[in-house]
């Protein structure tokens, strides 16, 4: 297993190895903070094996609460799209099975996504101590270490800088795919610079 960074014991150093088998995740939520009651409304992920995309996961989640208009404006996800969709427990059960053969997940600003996945696990299993069970790499850490001079390390900025896309779509699966391409570009840059 790769070296860990300080803080969350699940967090791995993005420069501790050349990851080739991993899952890249992205989430869409009803707000910015689990602590303020925001909930998951979409999980998107891509499974990578030997640097090739081999599987995708994309599920909407019914939070059983209103999706704020600013979230609908950003993601296009509204209340009508979530009616009849599975609840958090059903989706987390399926996501856990889907992730079970891969030890490492990645996300950009992973603490955000992981906090929502931790909360979803806690809600799904009525266990306040439960947590999402995978080690994770934060590509935000990698960007900051590669380019400490940059003012912005947002996905929307980086995907343009690395010529991946013109804009972030703010839908979980498409964002996960962009973050996968971003990780590969930054990892290759780190290798060229002798950082990996």
Model-derived features: where do they sit?
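Acidic, divalent-metal-coordinating active-site segment for phosphoryl/phosphodiester hydrolysis
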Residues: 171-184
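Generic alpha-helical structural context detector
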Residues: 141-144, 160, 181-184
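Mixed-charge, glycine-rich, non-catalytic linkers/tails in nucleic-acid processing enzymes
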Residues: 186-196
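Conserved beta-strand -> loop -> alpha-helix junction used to position metal-binding or nucleic-acid-contacting
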Residues: 130-143
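Conserved non-catalytic scaffold segment of RNase H-like nuclease domains
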Residues: 2-133, 148-170
């Amino acid at each position: 297993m790769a070296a860990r960074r300080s803080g969350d014991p699940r967090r791995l150093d993005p420069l501790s190895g050349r990851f080739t088998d991993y899952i890249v995740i992205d989430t869409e939520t009803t707000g910015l903070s689990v602590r303020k009651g925001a909930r998951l409304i979409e999980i998107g992920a891509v499974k990578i094996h030997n640097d090739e995309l081999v599987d995708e996961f994309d599920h909407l989640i019914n939070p059983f609460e209103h999706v704020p208009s600013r979230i609908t404006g950003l993601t296009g996800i509204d209340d009508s799209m979530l009616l009849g969709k599975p609840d958090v427990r059903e989706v987390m059960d399926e996501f856990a099975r889907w992730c079970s053969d891969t030890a490492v997940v990645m996300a950009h600003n992973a603490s955000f996504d992981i906090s929502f996945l931790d909360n979803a696990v806690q809600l799904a299993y009525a266990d306040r101590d439960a947590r999402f069970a995978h080690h994770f790499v934060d590509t935000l850490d990698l960007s900051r270490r590669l380019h400490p001079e940059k003012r912005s390390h947002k996905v929307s900025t980086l995907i343009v800088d690395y010529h991946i896309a013109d804009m972030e779509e703010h839908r979980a699966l498409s964002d996960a795919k962009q973050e996968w391409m971003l990780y590969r570009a930054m990892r290759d840059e780190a290798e060229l610079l002798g950082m990996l």
